[in-house]
Amino acid sequence: MVGGCCGRKILESRDEGELGYASLESKSEIPGKIMIDHVILTVSDFKRSVAFYAKALKPLGITTFIDYEGKDGHPDLKGFGDGKRYFFWLKEGKPDPQAVHVGFVAKDHSEVDAFYKAALAAGGKSKESPQARLEYYPGYYATWVLDPDGHDIEVVNKS
């Protein structure tokens, strides 16, 4: 498997070297190896966004933070992680919310629901309340919120 989105696996054809889509035959599992190392999201108000994500991501177990002081033209960053690694970063600047969609994995439906409540309480706006989206994938249960800058943030469980 090369990658996947919205319930479809993108497979590499060994014969032709082309990429194609294939249906999933079994229920999704949280992969043992994540192929994306990190995401940096540009936000307009650093303090506001740090406060929002600290509260909104807590139900997902993303509870540790690190400050990175940029040097030689690199921006200051705030990193979020699970205690083992930092993979979600914020930097201050001019955001382009239409250019970004970030999806976080939840271990079950209750984590999806808890994220939604926490995100709204932290100042996020509902895009879609937690619900099954079986047209994406069997067992696809997700919610979508807009962060304070309007970035589209999804939390999904595929069980």
Name each region found by the language model.
Residues C5-C6:
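Cysteine-centered motifs
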Residues S28-V50, V102, S159:
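N-terminal beta-strand motif that seeds the catalytic metal site of vicinal oxygen chelate
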Residues D37, T64, I153-K158:
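Long, contiguous binding/interaction regions
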Residues I40-R85:
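Core segments of cupin and vicinal oxygen chelate
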Residues S44-K47, G103-P148:
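Vicinal oxygen chelate
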Residues H74-Y116:
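Long, continuous compositionally biased terminal/linker segments
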